[in-house]
UniProtKB/Swiss-Prot annotation:
It comes from the Eukaryota. PANTHER family: RIBOSOMAL PROTEIN L30. One of its GO terms (cellular component) is cytosolic large ribosomal subunit. NCBIfam families: PRK01018.1 (NF002172). This is Large ribosomal subunit protein eL30. Keywords: Ribonucleoprotein, Ribosomal protein. Expressed in roots and leaves. It comes from Triticum aestivum (Wheat). SUPFAM superfamilies: L30e-like. InterPro entries: Ribosomal_eL30-like, Ribosomal_eL30-like_sf, Ribosomal_eL30_CS, Ribosomal_eL8/eL30/eS12/Gad45.
Amino acid sequence: MAPTKKAKKSGENINNKLQLVMKSGKYTLGYKTVLKTLRSSLGKLIILANNCPPLRKSEIETYAMLAKISVHHFHGNNVDLGTACGKYYRVCCLSILDPGDSDIISTTTTTQ
């Protein structure tokens, strides 16, 4: 039971940090805008839902590797990611341009 509690707690931690980014930072939502930020190397972190289509996922990961931007795989589907962002719609991928008051970039790179 302890590992599941730890996984749930880290998931809640990511959700809290993501909400802080939504309030105080800059971000883009959606596949096309994420690709634009990757091409221009503006993003600091890319977050993908676990049910993101494989072709989109591989394309985003390839662009992120070329731009040297880290990718975090969210442990929920696109509905959960949209809810964590405080939106009422599904979010497949998002790019964090400026984390604001949140330290989400340092915590997600150390957990992977």
